[in-house]
């Protein structure tokens, strides 16, 4: 499993990456999560403009065998949904790059830094 060092992680297996402006971030599911879910066939997300609290559900990922909720890693506003998700298998193929789910304006960049780093996430997953 791939666990990039430059991301932060949640216990719910989402990742977040602050962009260069320091207040906008990309969010997706981890390689571990996509592997556990299996073949992803559909992703449903709340619309851009939705304001989320930390841990609030912002969508679902539907795989062949199950449906999993997606939880906001931090509070903020959804700015953009990944247009490539029309082909949901992109999440399986490239969860950390082309398979990102949403771009969000984070309410507190400090909250991102408080999430799990790569080493802590490795320990959580046993990888």
From Swiss-Prot:
InterPro entries per UniProt: 2-oxoA_DH_lipoyl-BS, Biotin_lipoyl, GCV_H, GCV_H/Fam206, GCV_H_sub, Single_hybrid_motif
One of the record's GO cellular component terms: glycine cleavage complex
Domain of life assignment: Bacteria
The keyword DNA-binding is annotated on this UniProt entry: no
UniProt cofactor note: Binds 1 lipoyl cofactor covalently.
Assembly mode: The glycine cleavage system is composed of four proteins: P, T, L and H.
HAMAP family xrefs: GcvH
UniProt xrefs under PANTHER family: GLYCINE CLEAVAGE SYSTEM H PROTEIN (PTHR11715), GLYCINE CLEAVAGE SYSTEM H PROTEIN-RELATED (PTHR11715:SF3)
Name of the protein: Glycine cleavage system H protein
Source lineage: Bacteria, Pseudomonadati, Chlorobiota, Chlorobiia, Chlorobiales
Gene from which this protein is expressed: gcvH
